[in-house]
Amino acid sequence: MALVVKDIVKNFGEGLSETKVLKGINFEVEQGEFVILNGASGSGKTTLLTILGGLLSQTSGTVLYNDAPLFDKQHRSSDLRLEDIGFIFQSSHLVPYLKVIEQLTLVGQEAGMTKQQSSKRAIQLLKNIGLEDRLNVYPHQLSGGEKQRVAIMRAFMNNPKIILADEPTASLDADRATKVVEMIRQQIKEQQMIGIMITHDRRLFEYADRVIELEDGKITD
């Protein structure tokens, strides 16, 4: 299975005020592959990621998953749901009144897991990041790095088929950033997901299978 991006164009506005943000984007990402998107501010990275996540419609072009359109106008496809896409953002966006374990279990239950299944998976994921002793604390009791690790495991909670990450390490120091990207890569490889991450940090490029460079809405050679 692969994610295939064909001739994606995105314009904002109309007439004289129209801005062309994406200008014919083409690439493929295979199952189990971890790809980094890089480019200057305004190059179209976040717009592209938002389209891939089904949160924004392209002006023209097609995104295919397993040879079928990723989303139609109702944001549905034959074999992929919005729940099958995991998002990781620069900020953790944890729910302040939920304990760490609950941040994950609620995601699992919403995806159809039983309470027991959800709890078992959440504990295992939190063990993987060394937070098994923090299950019952609240977000304000966590460090910035711990919050981001919880947010990342939350994205993997329901075994998504695609992971989209937008600058998930921007607020972290070099050591923590490396650990976060290693963690993301490991999950993508182990679960054979499709992973796409935006980052400006060239030190992290070595963890990607491939780096796609965007400039002025186009992929550079």
From Swiss-Prot:
Keyword line: ATP-binding, Cell membrane, Membrane, Nucleotide-binding, Translocase, Transport
Gene3D superfamilies to which the protein is assigned, alphabetical: P-loop containing nucleotide triphosphate hydrolases (3.40.50.300)
EC number(s) given by UniProt: 7.6.2.-
Location of this chain's protein in the cell: Cell membrane
Membrane topology designation: Peripheral membrane protein
Record carries keyword Nucleotide-binding: yes
Enzyme class: translocase
Residues binding ATP: G39, A40, S41, G42, S43, G44, K45, T46
Annotated ABC transporter domain residues: 3-221
Coiled-coil parts of chain: none
One term under GO cellular component: plasma membrane
Described purpose of this protein according to its UniProt entry: Part of the ABC transporter complex hrt involved in hemin import. Responsible for energy coupling to the transport system.
PANTHER family hit by this protein: HEMIN IMPORT ATP-BINDING PROTEIN HRTA-RELATED, IMPORT ATP-BINDING PROTEIN
Oligomeric and partner information: The complex is composed of two ATP-binding proteins (HrtA), two transmembrane proteins (HrtB) and a solute-binding protein.
Official protein name in the record: Putative hemin import ATP-binding protein HrtA
Species, as recorded: Staphylococcus aureus (strain MRSA252)
